[in-house]
Regions:
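Non-heme di-metal
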Residues: 1-148
């Protein structure tokens, strides 16, 4: 909300953000309950979601360029997704500390390490793209300033 610099929009976005947070807590708690009831099945589902996740809007033409613009504004990017969403919920659920996961569930849990490694690589690659974008923007601003 603050990024838009418009008081009415900020207030509306604050309400949306609060509502989204309540949804996140609800779903996080539902998964936690699933882990208590059927840990192996829950880990398989967690794995499926993380392994198939794409950023909202991924299929929209020009998504990558728009994602970079959004990221440079500090709104959202793959690093934030990993650090603010994925890793905290995995810690909350104690995925890697649980002793009630076995068999196929254990394979899915171990493969979560690969997914996290892939997410870190994606975040690193995206940070490079973002840095190049910011560099281009700075050069463009310098050229504009030189014209004045």
């Amino acid at each position: 909300g603050v990024a838009c610099a418009e008081p009415i929009a900020q207030e509306l976005l604050k309400h949306i953000s609060n509502d989204e947070n309540l949804h996140m807590i609800f779903y996080r708690n539902m998964v936690e309950a699933g882990l208590e009831i059927a840990p192996n099945q829950a880990v398989k589902s967690i794995h499926k979601v993380l392994d198939n996740f794409t950023m909202p809007g991924y299929t929209i033409p020009g998504f990558r360029r728009n994602a970079v613009t959004i990221a440079t504004g500090g709104v959202y990017d793959p690093q934030l997704h990993l650090a603010e969403v994925v890793q905290p919920v995995l810690r909350k659920w104690r995925i890697f500390e649980r002793d009630d996961i076995n068999g196929e569930g254990e394979w899915y849990r171990e493969d979560l390490d690969r997914i996290i490694t892939d997410l870190k690589k994606t975040a690193s690659d995206f940070d490079e793209v973002k840095a190049k974008y910011l560099e281009r923007q700075a050069k463009r601003a310098e050229r504009q300033a030189a014209k004045v």
